[in-house]
């Protein structure tokens, strides 16, 4: 019997970010390859982090190219289902919406995998108040967490929702070292240098800790952005007088990134705009205690006082207090790290994600 054919219209790396990485995992998923004939169209018009949010001729060319590739695939194939990972607000939504409508025009079933949030900020504005209901009507919508549902509840009914948490590959079958032996505790921030990820909040917290005489080194890893270049970051560090406590290492990948995860003591992600950060799952895999914020679906990942601390968003004082508590209590760091590792193994492996996404596709063709 011929396998059902599925069309995946998703952003693929580069650039490397959460949604693109999940799409890449889906593209490589053996369970899907065994059950279905899978076609992919790259929805991303950016090829590096610097291009995100900027207009260029090449981005228009890529958009038009992706649209006509999608049109050709819909004409020449009979798809049992179209899976789309789209932006739900702003110009990104206006760019992605035509792909959903094209699939609907051909009478195909549609699943939308929602990796972002922000619909509530534009749902009452033109043209979104007309377009959003059109795009999401008669679709199934995959959310990463029920905590994200309030953002889309004006447009999407609860009956349309399917919950599927993200998962990441397991780097090693061996258990990580739960106890680190650094003479000076090492903190790790791993994200692109974007203000909404809490870069300045963490720098301010570092200043508070340094002024108190706390001993630590805060390691920043991630690519530069248009808002925060290396020069801007280093100036911010100098202005706060924390040059001896903060190091920017630039972006790191593969073994280079792993070496930081295996050697630091505390992972910090003071974000103000996230859905379900993969970087937190990475930290849990390496048994790191986490300090983060209650944004998006993070409460499903980090349980306060169990595998980390949840702090108030954009509050350097609260962040500094949480860091100071873990700096002073090595046993608590180990305990939180062990709890996080067990939670990761139970819920957030790529193997579990692949099983979930494959079953969702099967149930909806």
What name fits each language-model region?
Residues 231-252:
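Nucleotide-activated donor-binding/catalytic signature segment of Leloir-type glycosyltransferases, i.e.
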Residues 7-9, 178-197, 202-206, 218-224:
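Conserved donor-binding/catalytic core segment of Leloir-type glycosyltransferases
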Residues 132-174:
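Donor nucleotide-sugar binding/catalytic pocket of nucleotide-sugar-dependent glycosyltransferases
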Residues 289-292, 302:
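Short hydrophobic beta-strand element within catalytic cores of glycosyltransferases
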Residues 42-46, 190, 217-231, 250-251:
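Glycosyltransferase donor-sugar binding loop
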Residues 304-305, 309-316, 325-331:
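Conserved acidic donor-binding segment of nucleotide-sugar-dependent glycosyltransferases
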């Amino acid at each position: 019997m011929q396998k059902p054919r599925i069309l995946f219209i998703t952003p693929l790396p580069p650039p490397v970010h959460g949604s693109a990485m999940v799409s890449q995992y889906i593209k490589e998923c053996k369970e899907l390859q065994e059950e279905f004939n899978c076609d992919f169209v790259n929805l991303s018009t950016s090829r590096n982090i610097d291009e995100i949010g900027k207009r260029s001729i090449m981005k228009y060319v890529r958009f038009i190219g992706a649209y006509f590739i999608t049109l050709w695939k819909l004409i020449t194939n009979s798809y049992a289902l179209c899976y789309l990972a789209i932006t739900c607000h702003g110009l990104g939504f206006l760019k992605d919406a035509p792909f959903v409508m094209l699939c609907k025009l051909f009478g195909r079933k549609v699943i939308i995998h929602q990796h972002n949030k922000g619909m509530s900020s534009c749902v009452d504005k033109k043209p979104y108040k007309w377009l959003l209901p059109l795009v999401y009507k008669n679709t199934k919508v995959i959310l990463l967490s029920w905590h994200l549902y309030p953002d889309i509840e004006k447009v999407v009914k609860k009956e349309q929702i399917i919950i599927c948490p993200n998962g990441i590959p397991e780097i090693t079958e061996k258990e990580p070292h739960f106890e680190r032996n650094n003479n000076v505790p090492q903190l790790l921030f791993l994200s692109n240098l974007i203000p909404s990820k809490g870069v300045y909040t963490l720098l301010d917290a570092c200043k508070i800790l340094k002024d108190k005489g706390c001993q630590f080194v805060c390691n920043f890893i991630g690519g530069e952005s248009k808002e925060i270049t290396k020069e801007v970051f280093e100036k911010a560090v100098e202005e706060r007088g924390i040059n001896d406590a903060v190091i920017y290492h630039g972006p790191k990948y593969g073994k280079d990134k792993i070496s930081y995860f295996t050697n630091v003591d505390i992972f910090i992600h003071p974000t103000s705009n996230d859905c379900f950060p993969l970087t937190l799952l990475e930290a849990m895999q390496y048994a790191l205690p986490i300090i983060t914020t209650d944004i998006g679906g993070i409460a499903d990942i980090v349980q306060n006082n169990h595998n980390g601390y949840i702090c108030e968003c954009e509050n350097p004082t609260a962040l500094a207090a949480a860091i100071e508590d873990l700096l002073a209590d090595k046993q608590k760091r180990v305990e939180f790290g062990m709890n996080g590792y067990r939670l990761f193994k139970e819920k957030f492996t790529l193997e579990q994600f692949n099983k979930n996404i494959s079953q969702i596709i099967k149930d909806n063709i």
